[in-house]
């Protein structure tokens, strides 16, 4: 859970009470937080999982008692298509095997919304289905795009799901300099799954989930 003094802990209430004027400042802070993650030196990361086309690293999170994960791999598609498949929209459920539902609860502008999504159980249901309510923001970054998000406090709950919490997370996607039809996709994820789960199960699930994310996304892009 977020530190009570963390600026992220009251984001949901701020969005509801202060409206769009505050959403702009939240968007900027979220973007800057992800850019800070993107500038973390290589020697601070430890490899958590490495497969043919994806590497996943981790380091202790500064937001909660868990890990910040970094994942990176090359996608055989242009930036806009890659990000359009990741951010809230019609394509995400077509390819993401972990996600079971996605609804936009509030739409602020074209690139900014609050969404609710659910995920399937993992590790033979040691990790039961989860629900997340996230503020999502997509913005230009260098020659590409950044799609980022953070969980918000939302009063409506559903008893069949455990409410998880995403600390600031996001996906940087930029064209390869020598092959602009391909994109380098780099993700930063720090999810508090909450509930009574062994930490070893969380660590196994997170690294595998990120590797599978790239595999599933590649398949989805080929079908598009």
Curated annotation (Swiss-Prot):
<protein>
    <recommendedName>
        <fullName>StAR-related lipid transfer protein 4</fullName>
    </recommendedName>
</protein>
<keyword id="KW-0445">Lipid transport</keyword>
<dbReference type="GO" id="GO:0032367">
    <property type="term" value="P:intracellular cholesterol transport"/>
</dbReference>
<keyword id="KW-0446">Lipid-binding</keyword>
<dbReference type="GO" id="GO:0005783">
    <property type="term" value="C:endoplasmic reticulum"/>
</dbReference>
<feature type="domain" description="START">
    <location>
        <begin position="16"/>
        <end position="224"/>
    </location>
</feature>
<dbReference type="GO" id="GO:0015485">
    <property type="term" value="F:cholesterol binding"/>
</dbReference>
<keyword id="KW-0813">Transport</keyword>
<dbReference type="InterPro" id="IPR042555">
    <property type="entry name" value="StarD4"/>
</dbReference>
<dbReference type="InterPro" id="IPR002913">
    <property type="entry name" value="START_lipid-bd_dom"/>
</dbReference>
<dbReference type="GO" id="GO:0005739">
    <property type="term" value="C:mitochondrion"/>
</dbReference>
<dbReference type="Pfam" id="PF01852">
    <property type="entry name" value="START"/>
</dbReference>
<comment type="function">
    <text>Involved in the intracellular transport of cholesterol. Binds cholesterol or other sterols.</text>
</comment>
<dbReference type="InterPro" id="IPR023393">
    <property type="entry name" value="START-like_dom_sf"/>
</dbReference>
<dbReference type="GO" id="GO:0005829">
    <property type="term" value="C:cytosol"/>
</dbReference>
């Amino acid at each position: 859970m977020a530190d009570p003094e963390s600026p992220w802990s009251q984001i949901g209430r701020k969005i509801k009470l202060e409206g769009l004027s505050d959403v702009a400042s939240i968007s900027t802070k979220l973007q800057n937080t992800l850019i800070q993650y993107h500038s973390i030196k290589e020697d601070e990361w430890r490899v958590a999982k490495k497969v043919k086309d994806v590497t996943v690293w981790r380091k202790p999170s500064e937001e909660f008692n868990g890990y910040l994960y970094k994942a990176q791999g090359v996608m055989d598609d242009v930036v806009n298509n890659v990000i359009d498949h990741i951010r809230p929209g019609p394509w995400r459920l077509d390819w993401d095997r972990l996600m079971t539902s996605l609804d936009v609860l509030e739409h602020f502008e074209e690139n900014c919304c609050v969404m609710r999504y659910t995920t399937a159980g993992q590790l033979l249901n040691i990790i039961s289905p989860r629900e997340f309510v996230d503020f999502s923001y997509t913005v230009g970054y260098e020659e590409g795009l950044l799609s980022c998000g953070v969980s918000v406090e939302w009063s409506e709950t559903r008893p069949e799901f455990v409410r998880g919490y995403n600390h600031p997370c996001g996906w940087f996607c930029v064209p390869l300099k020598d092959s602009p039809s391909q994109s380098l996709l780099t993700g930063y994820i720090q999810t508090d799954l909450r509930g009574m789960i062994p930490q070893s199960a969380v660590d196994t699930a997170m690294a595998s989930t990120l590797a599978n994310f790239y595999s599933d996304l590649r398949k989805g892009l080929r079908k598009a």
